[in-house]
Amino acid sequence: MENTDELVSIELPAPASWKKLFYPKRAGTPRKTEIVFVAPTGEEISSRKQLEQYLKAHPGNPVISEFEWTTGETPRRSSRISQKVKATTPTPDKEPLLKKRRSSLTKKDNKEAAEKNEEAAVKENMDVDKDGKTENAEAEKEKEKEGVTEIAEAEKENNEGEKTEAEKVNKEGEKTEAGKEGQTEIAEAEKEKEGEKAEAENKEAEVVRDKKESMEVDTSELEKKAGSGEGAEEPSKVEGLKDTEMKEAQEVVTEADVEKKPAEEKTENKGSVTTEANGEQNVTLGEPNLDADAEADKGKESKEYDEKTTEAEANKENDTQESDEKKTEAAANKENETQESDVKKTEAAVAEEKSNDMKAEDTNRSLEANQVQQQQGAAASVSC
């Protein structure tokens, strides 16, 4: 219970951080509203429009549907209204008969009424005939419509059947075309594979030829060395070298293709025959110092490698020196450019100062001239 301005108010449940006050009416009081909401800021709101404006201006408050403008009590109903609702009027089963009016018509009125009745009967007959004709026409129209719809449906079915048949034919044609295309693609792929196999075989034949040529050159060199040497060459060493070369050739051929085995056997037989012939010749010629020649070749190769490494190191040092010189030159050029720019800036500043001084002198001279003219004018006016 709260007492504000001698008015009794009752606090009712309200949304969070809000207050709902109920002011019961009193006779002779000017207050119209019974319920007043008090906002968290202390503002009193007594109408829905005011509440909407406040909620729009202050977001974060509860929804307007949470604010109830009733006290929460069911209103009392008078006994008179409840009795009226309970009392149900009985519905009459038959309409009450109206009182017949006494007719005080003359004979003429009776004749006119009879004529009117006859005309009405004739009109009714005409209407019946028209209704029958219209019904027949409507039935005929309905039959015609049904026949047209049946014909249209039959045509649609025929068209659909033709479409389905055409689609089937097209699909079958597409399948046959796809099968033909697939067969052509397979044939092309097989041709490509055959061409690749032929190329691989040609490459393998070239490799074998190169190996044969290298072997023949090696054998000729060995024969020359054996002829120029002091003693007779041992046949076992020569045969060992040739056997290693032949094994390398055999490995290359086996990796390339298995079909070339007969050719490899022929080359091996030829190589063995040549080795036997060369062995017999070398036995007669003498044994050369192959180890000494190999060591001499290794020494030459090591010397050449050392010379190349020293040259590369010297070139690297020269490159580093050149890059350092270029960097120093670039730094010197930058310093010279900065000095030149500073000199230009100072010259420009001096020129600006001179121009400003000249402008100031010109303005001073013009002011002095104006003052002199004003003084002369004042003196002339005084003399006048």
UniProtKB/Swiss-Prot annotation:
Record's keyword annotation contains Transcription: yes
A GO cellular component entry from the record: cytosol
Chain intervals for the UniProt region annotation (Disordered): 65-384
Compartment annotation: Nucleus
GO molecular function, one term: methyl-CpG binding
Bias type Low complexity, positions: 369-384
Chief localisation class: nucleus
Positions of modified residues (Phosphoserine): S323
Tissue: Expressed in leaves, buds, flowers, stems and siliques.
Span of domain MBD: 4-74
Record has Mitochondrion as a keyword: no
Coiled coil (UniProt feature): 100-224, 310-356
Compositionally biased intervals (Basic and acidic residues): 106-227, 234-250, 257-269, 295-365
Residue ranges with Polar residues bias: 80-91, 270-284
Changes seen on gene knockout: Impaired nucleolar dominance.
UniProt keyword list: Coiled coil, DNA-binding, Nucleus, Phosphoprotein, Transcription, Transcription regulation
Domain of life: Eukaryota
Entry domain remark: The methyl-CpG-binding domain (MBD) functions both in binding to methylated DNA and in protein interactions.
Record's function text: Probable transcriptional regulator. Required for nucleolar dominance that consist in the silencing of rRNA genes inherited from one progenitor in genetic hybrids.
Name of the molecule in the record: Methyl-CpG-binding domain-containing protein 10
Species name: Arabidopsis thaliana
Gene: MBD10
